[in-house]
């Protein structure tokens, strides 16, 4: 079998109808985006008799969305770098059958992320550090510097790549916050936060601090500014994903008052 490009949305629908049987295991959460991905020539299929992989072309690898009905039918795709995300409820634990199946297909465990949430009235206010200035990016150069930092700081396979084509929109919408301080009259860039708003919930999409500035509460300053800028009422809501392994980040969010909502994601990769 070889990868086959999906040319029409109707073909995507056929795959969903055929393989999306009752009781199947699936992580296909691109249904709202599928038409756009097809128009961009970035959606491919790799289908067996009972199982199917949908693959989205990324920068140097493929992100895999699966429909699994038979854990004995192995889909083996050699010579390609693959990444997939398994969503699960923390209290129930990882779906062992899905993990074991993907391991048979050549995938290995990679990272675990946990989802946290908070409401404004439950979040703690911290004392402002007057040396650290947090403001929305004012230029495209500032937005570019932020995403260069994000790309250097985060896992290339399971992170969300943002195309430079949307930088201008992020600038106009004040979606990128920059942290800096004056150093001998010059602005010293320390870190950045990228936010998105979905269904009246403010999300931390990316946050990173330059290596030489870590340990000086720059991340906390960015988080505080993000919360205050998006406060509409005491019931304003905020959400984020954080790497389970990043103990410093977990402590920062929990100190602020964010709580784990019982939802996690395991990424697996095949190199």
Segment roles from a protein language model:
Residues 70-82, 209, 215-229, 251-255:
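Conserved acetyl-CoA-binding loop-helix of GNAT-fold acetyltransferases
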Residues 56-60, 162-183, 187-208:
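A conserved beta-strand-loop-helix scaffold within acyl/acetyltransferase catalytic domains
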Residues 27-80, 191-205:
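Conserved donor-binding loop and adjoining core beta-sheet/short helix segment
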Residues 93-111, 220, 244-262:
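Conserved active-site alpha-helix within GNAT-family acetyltransferase domains
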Residues 204, 225-230, 238, 249:
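Short hydrophobic clusters on alpha-helical segments that form packing/core surfaces
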Residues 68-132, 267-269:
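Acyl-donor-binding surface of acyltransferase catalytic domains
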Residues 88-90, 204, 238-242:
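Conserved hydrophobic beta-strand within the GNAT/NAT acetyltransferase core sheet
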Residues 1-30, 127-160:
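Short amphipathic alpha-helix that is part of the acyltransferase structural core
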């Amino acid at each position: 079998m070889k990868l086959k490009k999906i040319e029409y949305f109707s073909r995507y629908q056929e795959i969903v109808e055929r393989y999306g049987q009752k009781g199947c295991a699936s992580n296909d959460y691109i249904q709202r985006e599928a038409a756009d991905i097809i128009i961009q020539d970035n959606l491919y299929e790799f289908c067996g008799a009972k199982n199917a992989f949908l693959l989205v072309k990324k920068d140097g690898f493929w992100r895999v969305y699966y429909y699994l009905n038979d854990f004995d039918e192995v889909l083996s795709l050699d010579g390609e770098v693959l990444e997939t995300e398994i969503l699960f409820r923390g209290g129930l634990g990882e779906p062992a059958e899905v993990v074991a199946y993907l391991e048979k297909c050549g995938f290995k465990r990679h990272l675990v992320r946990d989802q946290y949430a908070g409401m404004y009235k439950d979040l703690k206010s911290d004392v402002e550090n007057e040396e650290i200035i947090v403001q929305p990016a004012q230029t495209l150069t500032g937005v570019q510097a932020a995403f260069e930092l994000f790309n250097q700081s985060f896992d290339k396979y399971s992170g969300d790549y943002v195309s430079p084509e949307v930088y201008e929109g992020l600038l106009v919408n004040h979606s990128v916050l920059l942290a800096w301080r004056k150093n001998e009259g010059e602005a010293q860039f320390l870190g950045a936060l990228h936010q998105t708003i979905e269904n009246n919930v403010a999300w931390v999409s990316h946050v990173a601090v330059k290596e030489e500035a870590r340990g000086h509460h720059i991340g906390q300053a960015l988080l505080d500014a993000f919360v205050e800028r998006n406060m509409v009422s005491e019931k304003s809501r905020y959400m984020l994903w954080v790497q389970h392994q990043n103990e410093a980040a977990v402590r920062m969010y929990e100190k602020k008052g964010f709580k784990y909502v019982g939802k996690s994601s395991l990424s697996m990769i095949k190199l």
